[in-house]
Amino acid sequence: MNSYDPQDTASEQQEETVALKGHFYGVYLLCSQSLDPRFRGKCYVGFTVNPKRRIRQHNLGCDFGGARKTSRRGPWLMVMIVHGFPNNTVALQFEWAWQQPSLSTRLKMYPELKRKLPRETFFDYNFRILSHMLGVGPWNRLPLSVRWLETDYERPFNMPLPNHMDIVSGKVSISASQRKRTDDAEVPPPVAWASECHLCMQQIEQPERSRLGCTNQMCRLTCHMMCLANYLLGDEPGHYIPVGGQCPLCENRLSWAALLQRKRLLLGVPKELRDYDEDLIEDIDVDSNIEDTP
C-alpha cells in the first residue's frame, strides 16, 4: 500500500500544488503497513523537498534512495507532512528534534516526551511530540502548515496550535514551473524600488539579498529585511521571527510568510540551483530512532 501510488491517477488529480520546485521544505511522518507484526505500525520521521518522490524511494528500498530503517519494513504510508519552513536548515533542525525529543533543548521542559507510554501506539507518540513542538519557539513563530495526507489518521491536536498555522488535508504536489497554479502565487509585477530603506534611511547595499517590500502592489515600501523584521517585532519583545503586522507606509496588514514568498517569486530560482538544491538535500537522510523506543 503506497501513499503515492504512481498508477493511482485519481489521487494525482486531487493533489494540491503548494510550492514551486526549490521552495518546498517538508518534514513528514511515515507509518508502516507491513503484514509482519514486528514492523506494522512503526513510524519514521524524515525530511524531503519532494514528497511524492520520497515515499516511492522509501517503498522501493535502499537501492533506490530509501532509508536503511524503512527498507523491507513497509509498505509505508506518508500520513502527514509539516511544511512552510523558510529553508532546509530550519526544516532539518525540526526533523532532528522530532526524531530525538529527549535530546532537543527546545523540548527539555517536556520530560514526558522522552519515552512512548506503555499502551501508546508509535503514531500517537509521534503525534504527541509534534503537538508540543508546534507550540514552542522558534517553531511556533514560523508560518507552518500541517497537512494530513491520509484521512484515516487525521485527528485533533492535543494542544492548541498558534492562530497563524494552518491545518489542511490532501495530497501535495510541487510545481516545476515558474508559477504556482493559484492566483495568489503569480509572479508579482516589476517593482519600482527606492534605493534607501524607508525605516533606517540608509542605502540598501545588497538589494536582492536584503530588500523587502509591501505585499500591497500600490505601496512603494522599500526596507532592509532586518529593519522591517525589527519594526514588526516592536510589540513582541524577545522574539526574532515576526508573524505579521502593519505596513509602516500604507498601513496594510502584512504577513511575514507572504512577504518572504513575494521576495522569492520576484527573484525566482535558476534551474541549475533548483536541481542542485534538490539533489543535495535529498542525499541527507538522518535515520529516526523513534520507532525503536520501547
From Swiss-Prot:
PROSITE patterns: GIY_YIG (PS50164). SUPFAM superfamilies: GIY-YIG endonuclease. It is found in: Nucleus. Keywords: DNA damage, DNA recombination, DNA repair, Endonuclease, Hydrolase, Metal-binding, Nuclease, Nucleus, Zinc, Zinc-finger. Its EC number is 3.1.-.-. GO terms for cellular component: Slx1-Slx4 complex. A zinc finger (SLX1-type) spans 197-250. Its main location: nucleus. It comes from the Eukaryota. GO terms for biological process: double-strand break repair via homologous recombination. GO terms for molecular function: 5'-flap endonuclease activity; crossover junction DNA endonuclease activity; zinc ion binding. InterPro entries: GIY-YIG_endonuc, GIY-YIG_endonuc_sf, Slx1, SLX1_C, SLX1_endonuclease, Znf_RING/FYVE/PHD. The keyword Membrane does not apply. Its cofactor is a divalent metal cation. Disulfide bonds: none annotated. SMART domains: GIYc. Catalytic subunit of a heterodimeric structure-specific endonuclease that resolves DNA secondary structures generated during DNA repair and recombination. Has endonuclease activity towards branched DNA substrates, introducing single-strand cuts in duplex DNA close to junctions with ss-DNA. Belongs to the SLX1 family. Forms a heterodimer with mus312/SLX4. This is Structure-specific endonuclease subunit SLX1 homolog. It comes from Drosophila erecta (Fruit fly).
